[in-house]
């Protein structure tokens, strides 16, 4: 009641306030009615529309903020909004025909045509010659296998092998796809075309341009990955590592060095000294380790690189934390390096826990 006895004037509550959204529900209802005069518009239609637009706006702003942070900028610009949309598969599909003013363009860069201006972030071996390529069989030689696979069993076997090889190379953009003894469990495409693939296999059998070997300052090869590579590469691989240790000296934390992949399907092995969990700035150093490995691969113009789960073995990183940091480092590297020669990054895993974590973290990579 007012002082004169009349009713107190009540303030009108807007439709947006009633629905609990910020975007103007009443205005959207007018726009919908204006464009569709023949149809009956439900009360919930503008509310749902406002909620969806509000969610999309918040999502784009969050991703644009991440892009600005990765580019070390303190203000979000239209360029960052364009990068945010392009880096999210669903948003990119939704806003494919939309032009963002002052956002620039996403060039289709061929790394082979660009001069390398950025210096290496890790220590390099002076001169490394990759192992000689295997001699191809002459076309005159007859293949007895073709004769032996006659009948239903042979046809069934060749069909099964064909399916395996198709599944292996379906999403790969590299010239040398991995061998048949593996399974691609998940694939993620980044906005500049690079592909991330979770692979269940033995890392020593992966036919990529480079494989990553987590080690220590003394190039120790007694860990899980090192032992596997030593078993496959044999004496030549061990001698190459010893020679690298002699030339390079102790490997600093987060540092990386490369040697030839003697006895391995991979041309090169990138040795990296990852930090120990609990050490000072260990998370930052793990990201730096991954970026240094990628930088070495770029310096050699390699197209594919295979990572194990760095840091989650003897160095004690929780598997999920290690996966998050590694994926974040890779995504950040490709955002800041527009001229990368790397087309495919493999995550070579063997245990179900690591596989599940990487598949899960890769699925929400854009949101992070």
Curated annotation (Swiss-Prot):
Cross-link Glycyl lysine isopeptide (Lys-Gly) (interchain with G-Cter in SUMO2), sequence positions: 123, 166, 188, 319
Region (Disordered): 128-179
Residue numbers bearing the Phosphothreonine modification: 129
Entry-annotated residues carrying Phosphoserine: 169, 172
UniProt feature, compositional bias: Basic residues: 144-159
UniProt domain Histone H2A: residue ranges: 2-117
Chief location of this protein within or outside the cell: nucleus
Protein's UniProt name: Core histone macro-H2A.1
Gene field: Macroh2a1
């Amino acid at each position: 009641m007012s002082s004169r006895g009349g009713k107190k004037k009540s303030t009108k509550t807007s439709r947006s306030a009633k629905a609990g959204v910020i975007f103007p529900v009443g205005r959207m209802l007018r726009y919908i009615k204006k464009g569709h005069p023949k149809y009956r518009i439900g009360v919930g239609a503008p509310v749902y529309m406002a909620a969806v637009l509000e969610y999309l706006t918040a999502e784009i702003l969050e991703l644009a903020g991440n892009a600005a942070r990765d580019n070390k900028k303190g203000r979000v610009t239209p360029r960052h909004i364009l990068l945010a949309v392009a880096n999210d598969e669903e948003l990119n599909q939704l806003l494919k025909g939309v032009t963002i003013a002052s956002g620039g363009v996403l060039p289709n860069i061929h790394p082979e045509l660009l001069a390398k201006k950025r210096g290496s972030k890790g220590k390099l071996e002076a001169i490394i010659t990759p192992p000689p390529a295997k001699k191809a069989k002459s076309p005159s030689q007859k293949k007895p296998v073709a004769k032996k696979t006659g009948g239903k069993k042979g046809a069934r076997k060749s069909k099964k092998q064909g399916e395996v090889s198709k599944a292996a190379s379906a999403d790969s953009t590299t010239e040398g796809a991995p061998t048949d003894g593996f399974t691609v469990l998940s694939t993620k495409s980044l906005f500049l075309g690079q592909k991330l693939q979770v692979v269940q296999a033995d890392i020593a059998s992966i036919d990529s341009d480079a494989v990553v070997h987590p080690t220590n300052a003394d190039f120790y090869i007694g860990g899980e990955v090192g032992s596997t590579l030593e078993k496959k590469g044999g004496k030549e691989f061990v001698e190459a590592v010893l020679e690298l240790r002699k030339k390079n000296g102790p490997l600093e934390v987060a540092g990386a060095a490369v040697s030839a992949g003697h006895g391995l399907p991979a041309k090169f092995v990138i040795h990296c000294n990852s930090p120990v969990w609990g050490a000072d700035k260990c998370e930052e150093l793990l990201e730096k380790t991954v970026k240094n490995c990628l930088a070495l691969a770029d310096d050699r113009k390699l197209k594919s690189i295979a990572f194990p789960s760095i840091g989650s073995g003897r160095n004690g990183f929780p598997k999920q934390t290690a996966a998050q940091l590694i994926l974040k480092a890779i995504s950040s590297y490709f955002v800041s390096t527009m001229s990368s020669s790397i087309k495919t990054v493999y995550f070579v895993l063997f245990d179900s826990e690591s596989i599940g974590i990487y598949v899960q973290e890769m699925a929400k990579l854009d949101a992070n």
